[in-house]
Amino acid sequence: MNENFRTKPAKFLSCFFLTLLILYLPAPTFSQSKPTPPTGMIFIPEGYFPMGNSSGREDEKPLHFVYTRAFFIDKHEVSNAEYMKFIEATGHAKPTFWEDETLNLPNHPVVGVSWRDAMAYAKWKGGRLPTEAEWEKSARGNDDRLWPWGRKFDKGFFFYYVNVFGEDDNYKKTAPVNYYESGASPFGLLNMSGNVWEWCLDWYDKDFYRISSELNPQGPLSNGIYKVLRGGSYLNSIDGVQVVRRSRNRPHIKNEIYGFRTVLPMP
């Protein structure tokens, strides 16, 4: 079958149903009563949201609707100070770059942690890493925005919104985890674009969106090679930190631009 014949109607239908969802369907995700979240976390209500990007990279397609159960997620990336408490309590090895004075400030995100390190911390806290769907919903809210604050950006606002490469955002490397409040997501999360890439729970599959479940998708069930990373970092351009961008690496890899935040599922 001709590829254009298949993809053009699909794009039209994606846009059509997105419009219906936004304009006509109820939005239980914002109307539910909100339980009190644990300190430093934000409640994300259950409900549908549009995931992916119909005009983006191949692994971001198609735009599709996903339903997640309610959960709590960290308002900001795990900081060096928070990770130090984990090290002191468990004897876990210190991260790579722990002695780097440009990266180890207490209120900056911990970096140099592998996916396995991040999972160990999350389990110690009683939670886990977010799935891709949970992460994107927390960053995007209930519409098809490309950044936490919307679909547009102005060259003059980097100082207040996001930590990316080559812009006047006030930091050469990582920024404090509670910085850039103007760039918060619709739910109030900070640094969902830029600062550091964030490990997610899922194995990576470039074609997963084409076959994924509508309800609480969690990546391929079988072990893969790479784990998902989301959000971009201070070494990416503004396009590279869109909330739909997907990256990946092997779960043992540690990098100065890799950090994480945690999720606590609802009982």
Name what the model sees in each region:
Residues 256-267:
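Short, structured beta-strand segments at or near domain termini in extracellular proteins/domains
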Residues 58-63, 217, 246-251:
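Short, P/G- and charge-enriched loop/turn segments at secondary-structure junctions
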Residues 15-24:
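Bacterial N-terminal signal peptides
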